[in-house]
Every structure is written in structure tokens, then in C-alpha cells.
Amino acid sequence: MARISGIDLPSNKQLKIALTSIYGIGRTRALEVCNKADISSSKIAKDLDNDEVNRLRKVIESDYVVEGKLRSEVAMSIKRLMDIACYRGVRHRKGLPLRGQRTKTNARTRKGKRKTVANKKIASK
């Protein structure tokens, strides 16, 4: 079982799919990594030898920001927006959509479950 960037790659999948289990590597980037490391992207992950795993590891660590470092960069970027109190930072802080979507009826994913307002029907009479 290959271990890259602290993640065990799923051994029964093709390399182009197995690499997507690493945070920060999608399908396109997985193909790029395979091409740079001169490894067939359709090769099964459990068939990799140590030399190929080391080449993959070297390409990923030298050229891409992945896993913990990428997560911390994203968190720092969001924190910076919240600190400067720009529109996007305020929306992050309030837990609302950032990109102009309507919030009167939709945005349930971002806002969470509905919160019922007590005595709303009585007050509307």
C-alpha cells in the first residue's frame, strides 16, 4: 500500500483515481502528476514499486501544495477576509452564501437547519 503525503492510497484503484484521495489533487492534477513521474495513469495502485512511489512523492511534494499545508492556507485566507471585515469576510462570519445567491428562501446548506420562530403564527393575525 502506497503512502503519499500522509495518506494511504486505495490499493485496488487506478492511479489516476487513487491520487484523488489526497486533498488538493483532483482528476486533472492526478493525470499531471502521473505524466511528470512517467507512470501510466491506468496502473493499479497496489502494483506500484518503491521507485515509482518515490517518484510520485517527489513530484507531489516539490510541485504542489496538498493536505495539511493547503488546508491551513485556505483557513488563513478565510481568516484574513474575516479580519479585514470585507463583504466576503462578513458573510463567512455570519455563515451565509458569499457570491450573491438569494437567502430569503434558499441557502439551507450554508445556513443550516431551519430555526423555528416561537409564536410567529399568533403574531401574524
UniProtKB/Swiss-Prot annotation:
Entries under PROSITE patterns matching the protein: RIBOSOMAL_S13_1, RIBOSOMAL_S13_2
Q: Which PANTHER family match?
A: 30S RIBOSOMAL PROTEIN S13/40S RIBOSOMAL PROTEIN S18, SMALL RIBOSOMAL SUBUNIT PROTEIN US13M
Species whose genome carries this gene? Borreliella afzelii (strain PKo) (Borrelia afzelii)
- Where is region (Disordered) located? 95-125
Any GO MF annotation of the entry:
structural constituent of ribosome
User: Which InterPro entries does this UniProt record tie to the protein?
Assistant: Rbsml_uS13_C, Ribosomal_uS13, Ribosomal_uS13-like_H2TH, Ribosomal_uS13_bac-type, Ribosomal_uS13_CS
Q: What does this protein do?
A: Located at the top of the head of the 30S subunit, it contacts several helices of the 16S rRNA. In the 70S ribosome it contacts the 23S rRNA (bridge B1a) and protein L5 of the 50S subunit (bridge B1b), connecting the 2 subunits; these bridges are implicated in subunit movement. Contacts the tRNAs in the A and P-sites.
Which protein are we looking at?
Small ribosomal subunit protein uS13
Q: How does it assemble?
A: Part of the 30S ribosomal subunit. Forms a loose heterodimer with protein S19. Forms two bridges to the 50S subunit in the 70S ribosome.
Pfam families associated with the record: Ribosomal_S13 (PF00416)
Listed GO biological process terms: translation
Example of a GO cellular component annotation carried by this entry: cytosol
Keyword RNA-binding listed? The answer is: yes
The protein's UniProt keywords, in alphabetical order, are: Ribonucleoprotein, Ribosomal protein, RNA-binding, rRNA-binding, tRNA-binding
Q: Which domain of life is it from?
A: Bacteria
Q: Which family does it belong to?
A: Belongs to the universal ribosomal protein uS13 family.
